[in-house]
Amino acid sequence: MPNTSFLQRFLQVQLTLNKGEFADGKNSKIIDNLAISAKIEKLGPPDFGKASVEIYGMPLADMEQLTTLNFRPLFVSRNYINIFAGDDVNGMNQVFAGTIVSASADFNSQPETKFKIEAQIGFWGSVTAQAPTSIKGTQSVADFVAQQAKKAGMNFINEGVTASLRYCVFNGSPIQQARTAAFQVGAELITDDDDMILLPANKPRSGDVPLLSKDTGLLGYPSITQNGIEFKAIFNPAFKFAGLVELKSIVPKTSGQWRIVKLVHNLTSNMPNNGAWESQITGFYPHLSGAIGRFI
């Protein structure tokens, strides 16, 4: 992806109500003409990906429909948010999908009110209570995880795990049971947006490997930290959590392919005083960052 620092960028937020409807009589609304800022974090086990969104100038009736009472943390509506980012040249790409866990209006930011949303990937699949699951005999771990993904309301993708489970019992929510099963066979389970992805140990997600250099969106210079190689870049939808990125830099020992173990997008649109459109990436050795828990 070429350096696109001077393109006009767009954020699009789709809000879907589990119950009720907006003023237009529909249960889903797309917002793309208001000032929006979004911080999206893609994280690995035991955490979940999350997003913090602020929308300015939202109609009062819409805010009323979406507002939750934050002091009742277990009373969460099954409202859903999808976030898309892009530009006129490269089109729009989904960068987040998850359950709204809190939403409220801030009227102290006058002259523009802002509506603040916190969302989490796989929320209901992580808190839904269910009975223990007993496997009598042998079952492929892919089939077992697929069943748990369905219970969690997520899509299932198997990227090459062929191991089996034998005579075992799993407890907890659908996602907890799926994670435990993957760990038991030495595989890795990723929850990303609508997908539950099963990976062989220490293998990156499939797909193209974006090349990142000063000519293709690298911002500043990479840093070597205890957590891995950390660097910033102009947002690129090809960056995928648990996927690879190829880095080219003059900083010694930072060039090469790294597995993305933490991915944070800071994105804004229609905000004259804030043009943030960047990603913060932490990369680690591809062969050491998988099921052994090298997510940070």
Regions found by a protein language model. Give the residues of each.
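Glycine-rich, acidic and aromatic/proline-enriched surface loops and short helix-turn segments
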Residues: 140-155
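Short beta-strand-centered interaction patches in the first periplasmic/extracellular domains
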Residues: 2, 107-124, 151-222
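An acidic/polar, Gly/Ser/Thr-rich interaction patch typically located in mid-to-C-terminal regions
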Residues: 45-70, 201-296
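Extracytoplasmic/secreted envelope proteins and their assembly/folding machinery
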Residues: 97, 142-146, 175-179, 239-243, ...
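Assembly/oligomerization scaffold segments
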Residues: 1-115, 269-271
